[in-house]
Amino acid sequence: MGDDRPFVCNAPGCGQRFTNEDHLAVHKHKHEMTLKFGPARTDSVIIADQTPTPTRFLKNCEEVGLFNELASSFEHEFKKAADEDEKKAAAGPLDMSLPSTPDIKIKEEEPVEVDSSPPDSPASSPCSPPLKEKEVTPKPVLISTPTPTIVRPGSLPLHLGYDPLHPTLPSPTSVITQAPPSNRQMGSPTGSLPLVMHLANGQTMPVLPGPPVQMPSVISLARPVSMVPNIPGIPGPPVNSSGSISPSGHPIPSEAKMRLKATLTHQVSSINGGCGMVVGSASTMVTARPEQSQILIQHPDAPSPAQPQVSPAQPTPSTGGRRRRTVDEDPDERRQRFLERNRAAASRCRQKRKLWVSSLEKKAEELTSQNIQLSNEVTLLRNEVAQLKQLLLAHKDCPVTALQKKTQGYLESPKESSEPTGSPAPVIQHSSATAPSNGLSVRSAAEAVATSVLTQMASQRTELSMPIQSHVIMTPQSQSAGR
């Protein structure tokens, strides 16, 4: 059995044998793949199965082992690039300029330099005059001090007063900030230098120098700032190849994680562009404006290394900073707009309600006046009916039979074609003649006669006004003759 399969797998817990070396190599490769990708597959969030967003990547980078992989993959390339850039820096001064920016005037009273030194050097030191490079005892840098200060990448992360964003510079050189009143400038060499981070356990972790990275926490301006392409009298900064991290108040693993997060975040945000300052990857020189930047505060944990801190009053120019500030201010602005819309809607509703109520009041007044007019007309008509009834009651016993017979023929002749009913005269005669014989009450008969006469008189007014007038005139004459 052992002679047929002489090749044995030396992995712990596996004693399989194979006939040839190729099968053993394939088997060992399976072991390596399992050991390498096993923890990632058992993780709660599987990056391969989901959309690889920056948030998920930054959340799970430590569990996946991203730091070790980056250090082992790019260490040689970054060391080689650092050596080449060191040779270039030693050959001649760097051209601290950006190609696409206009010029502004600057004060040249205190020129500053970019200095990079080994990790045991202090993180911040006052700058010497140009063409002289010497180490000075580190002093705490306060806001009111007029001396410029060199801050190495080791003293990053940046601590904001109110914003927990920690961006980093993707270069081994330093950011020079200065507090006295002067113009602000920023320069960048055309070449880029990588940054290799040496961790405490002996490993090195490179930071990828991607496209120009926006620095919202180090360089912040409230108005547009221009760049100076070439500064006479200031030599290029001598760059040390180590680019290592100087001691700071925070533990080194947290700095490494934070640097990686900030680099990835700025590489994503720099694609969208913005109106912020673009920082080159080799060196950046900044001189502050009097009303806008006092940005160096000594870190409370470390006595000598000074870490830049942005005052809360300065606006952050990059897209990420604006987005974060907008998110912070959004609730108040949304509430303000919501209240304004509510007030406008309430005022419009009140106006509509006032118009509706006023129209209802006008309509009610019109209907009330019309009702009063109609009631007055009804009262007048009732009074007229009462008067006519009294006249009929007064003349109910008049001997008008002969006169009615005479006028009957005259009244019926023009009404034969239009009105077949009889004239009121025979009705009066019939009622007056039949009232005593039937034994009815005189008043009830008079009311019935008056009602019928009024209805017929109303119908005859339009057609036979003259005969009715003669009849009305003749009735009192016959009454007076009878009396």
From Swiss-Prot:
Give one GO molecular function term: DNA-binding transcription factor activity
Full protein name: Cyclic AMP-dependent transcription factor ATF-7
Q: Where is the composition biased (Polar residues)?
A: 429-440
Q: Where is this region: Basic motif?
A: 334-354
Zinc finger extent (C2H2-type): 7-31
Family indicated by similarity: Belongs to the bZIP family.
Give me the ranges of the annotated region Disordered.
110-148, 299-345, 407-440, 464-483
Entry PTM:
On EGF stimulation, phosphorylated first on Thr-53 allowing subsequent phosphorylation on Thr-51. This latter phosphorylation prevents sumoylation, increases binding to TAF12 and enhances transcriptional activity. Social isolation stress as well as TNF-alpha also induce the phosphorylation of ATF7. Phosphorylated in proliferating colonic and small intestinal epithelial cells.
Please give the residue positions where the record annotates the modification Phosphoserine.
413, 423
The protein's location, in the record's own words, is: Nucleus; Nucleus, Nucleoplasm; Chromosome, Telomere
Check the UniProt entry and state the signal peptide residues, or none. none
- Spans annotated as Leucine-zipper: 360-388
Q: What gene does this protein come from?
A: ATF7
Species this chain originates from: Pongo abelii (Sumatran orangutan)
In which residue ranges is the amino acid composition biased (Basic and acidic residues)?
326-343
Sequence segments annotated as region (Transactivation domain): 1-285
Gene Ontology CC, one term = nucleoplasm
* Subunit structure comment from the entry: Homodimer; binds DNA as homodimer. Heterodimer; heterodimerizes with other members of ATF family and with JUN family members. Interacts with JNK2; the interaction does not phosphorylate ATF7 but acts as a docking site for other ATF-associated partners such as JUN family members. Interacts (via its transactivation domain) with TAF12 (isoforms TAFII15 and TAFII20); the interaction potentiates the transactivation activity (isoform TAFII20 only) and is inhibited by ATF7 sumoylation. Interacts with TAF4; the interaction inhibits the TAF12-dependent transactivation.
